[in-house]
Amino acid sequence: MDDQSQPGHPQPDSVAAIASLNDPIRRSLFDLVSHSATAVGRDEAAATLGVPRGTVAFHLERLAQCGLLETEFQRRTGRTGPGAGRPAKLYRRAAHSITVSVPDRHYDLAGDLLSSAIEESDRTGEPVRQALTRVSVERGRSLGASAGSLDAVLTFTGYEPLDDGDGGLLLRNCPFHALAVSHTDTVCQANLALLNGAADGADEREREVCFAPRDGYCCVRIARRAG
């Protein structure tokens, strides 16, 4: 998983991206581009759909702004140099996936942690559970250092932190809920290690990460340090 796909990095608004397809012209354009073997230009799209070129250009740009399409420039005449004309702006479906879940889930992050742990175990002979803890701590440190605070990591990663009234936080949502239900020990271990790493990376001094399972909440809570 590259850095731009990690929680804590700005991402296109997934809800807005999906909602943008509610417009019938925009949906038709997205389908046209998605099913094309090559990048599609504005003239081609307008001719195929029988829609004015200006309208097509507007909707293609909106789809690109939402992160559903990527753009490139090409000279389709095959000519180069002076007199070859301006390159045409072309569109193709974005390579990354856009998903929407309510509450927020990050199964991509869980899958990356588990895959990395297995690869490390195969490479070094380290037991998989130990590798998972280490990999999760390292990823958490990276997220904490990048976000600048533990609270930012919790928010971006979908934990839905709530003030517990005692200087700490309850985490209303588990970003790995379905996996945690099926593989509780493994996923909760990785979750705890991830947030311990995030606290360390963000240089969190006033609070600590605790394993405290509670119905309706994440298995981890953030507690005020004693003393």
Task: Report residues per predicted region.
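Short, charged/polar, Gly/Pro-enriched secondary-structure boundary elements
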Residues: 96-101, 176-180, 226-227
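Short terminal or interdomain "cap/linker" segment that borders an active site or interface and mediates
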Residues: 205-227
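Conserved segment of winged-helix/HTH DNA-binding domains
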Residues: 81-120
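Mid-protein regulatory/catalytic core that forms ligand/cofactor-binding pockets
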Residues: 107-112, 116-210
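Generic recognition of long tandem-repeat/solenoid scaffolds
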Residues: 100, 168-173, 220-222
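Short beta-strand micro-motifs in enzyme catalytic cores
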Residues: 87-91, 167, 216-220
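A short catalytic or substrate-binding loop motif that flags glycine-/basic-rich loops and adjacent residues
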Residues: 83-84, 153, 214
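Basic, Lys/Arg-rich alpha-helical nucleic-acid-recognition elements, primarily the DNA-binding modules
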Residues: 1-94
